[in-house]
């Protein structure tokens, strides 16, 4: 019996993806729209190392990330390092390290890949890419105004129609005042109830009630007040005793100005928005997909006033958000917003005969120098097989250069979709292709 060789699996690591050319075209298109939108607001792109000291995340990231989701190990120099699960700690380190030289306000963005060890599921993988946008050095609500305007502009740039998403807004000080003043909870109780409220949408009402009961002093009265708070709007929330009036005033002013900028139809006040108890200190928001098939949070962010506290005595306020590629792709698919990304705007050039190989390459070189993306075959297989290659790769146009075309200083172009074929002059060919064929 012959020895059987155990081949390695071709599957990617659990929770990660291979990006074949067609998936890469989609990813590049998504990133280009995001990048183009953020750049239009005057933001600058940055990046940092994928490896950081474990201590950075221990000090800056949430408990769940550090204890259960972090990929960390001891390197060959006996240093404990971690693969970045989020970009904010790196951002804080970089800003603090160059704080004196940064003109304010600081407007930065990045699209890094991030790693978290968690159970892969719908909209959640172990490796994903995320647009991170941050604005520092502005203490007024103008920062929230710009960030929310950008969060809205990104989806509009993808063609998202009005009503396909909502921007839910709340304020951390509103929640804090409710828990401490209205419910009169201790700091320990506040921490536990906040964490439970943060995961409320992911558990059943029965589980939520059972888990919150031990955290309350007077269950019936306090639980009823919690239900009232979570169901409140901007008018009714102000009637709850102990609620911070400044937070309500802040959100009202913000909504009024955003309405004047044309995005009031997407805005919703939602006091159930938590966005991580240990992180945000002011206004918080989440963008939700309204499609019944994908009714979930797409991305979100908020205000943080202690960004660089681990590195510097200087205080620097900031606000930002993160938009992951997995949830964005799901949103675009559910709302049919992904265009045809086949290679229609590129040209395929077969080799008609070995004797004119150099002439064919000269033509393709000329086309590329004039800004037309051109793929050239590298051997003179039967023309039918070469066209099959072009069709399989998604090309629409094939350009033929044979001996007769060389003599007459022409080329033949064929539309693989319609089957139409016509002769074009060599002189001014690039301009003709750009104008008439939009290549």
Curated annotation (Swiss-Prot):
It is found in: Cytoplasm. InterPro entries: aa-tRNA-synth_II, aa-tRNA-synth_II/BPL/LPL, Anticodon-bd, Anticodon-bd_dom_sf, His-tRNA-ligase, HisRS-like_core, HisRS/HisZ, HisRS_anticodon. CDD domains: HisRS-like_core, HisRS_anticodon. The keyword DNA repair does not apply. Its main location: cytoplasm. Its EC number is 6.1.1.21. One of its GO terms (cellular component) is cytoplasm. GO terms for biological process: histidyl-tRNA aminoacylation. Keywords: Aminoacyl-tRNA synthetase, ATP-binding, Cytoplasm, Ligase, Nucleotide-binding, Protein biosynthesis. It catalyses: tRNA(His) + L-histidine + ATP = L-histidyl-tRNA(His) + AMP + diphosphate + H(+). Belongs to the class-II aminoacyl-tRNA synthetase family. Homodimer. This is Histidine--tRNA ligase. It comes from Leptospira borgpetersenii serovar Hardjo-bovis (strain JB197).
